[in-house]
Regions:
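A structural motif corresponding to the C-terminal lobe/cap of the Radical SAM core domain
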Residues: 1-153
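Membrane-proximal basic amphipathic "stem/tether" segments
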Residues: 133-193
């Protein structure tokens, strides 16, 4: 059967969903996720895109906080990028924000070239903080442990990823050791980079 569902929720703000031409509402996304959970979906990932050209800080925060209100197992927060062949690429070329083939091989975040966008570094910090808050909620942790114990798929996946998890934790501990020595602050969390 189906083990993982990946929902392209994108935003909790109708104005931004309209900009993306999504033809959905935040409430429809909420209903879809709840329905999938009730139907027995084992792992549900919610994908969100922040950093649209005129998206406000409050709208970005609203989207990040929306993830906490729906029964997903993991949020994937993406910062909107501009890539060749997309409508936004054409829009930005027409506005003169892209010149002579710049970024055609790699693309670029909207927030790095659009003067009306929230700055990239600020969005990145908001996303980082939002993911941290999402995964540190006591209700989230307890539900994930309970789901792990009930799901052979999750147990198998966790066991298969133990070496990877060890590498992530080790990398984090090595990076944080210098920080603790410089600041004298207590260790705050294992998976925050």
């Amino acid at each position: 059967g189906c083990k993982i569902l990946y929902f392209g929720i994108e935003s909790a703000n109708q104005r931004i969903l309209n900009y993306y031409n999504k033809r959905i509402t935040p409430e429809e996304s909420r209903t879809a996720v709840r329905t999938a959970r009730k139907a027995g979906a084992d792992v549900i990932v919610g994908s969100f895109i922040v950093g649209a050209p005129d998206e406000t800080r409050e709208e970005i925060r609203n989207t990040i906080e929306f993830a906490n209100t729906i029964p997903i197992d993991a949020p994937q927060f993406n910062i909107l990028g501009v890539y060749p062949g997309t409508e936004i690429w054409d829009e930005f070329e027409a506005k003169g924000l892209l010149k002579g083939g710049e970024y055609w091989e790699t693309g670029i975040a909207v927030s790095e070239i659009c003067p009306t966008a929230v700055p990239y570094k600020e969005i990145r910090q908001m996303v980082h903080d939002g993911f941290y808050r999402f995964t540190r909620r006591p209700s989230y942790v307890s539900k994930q442990v309970a789901r792990l114990m009930k799901s052979p798929y999750r147990i198998r996946t966790a066991l298969n990823n133990l070496p990877r998890l060890g590498g992530i934790v080790g990398h984090h501990l090595r990076g944080r050791a210098g920080h603790r020595q410089r600041t004298g602050r207590a260790f705050r969390g294992l998976l925050v980079s």
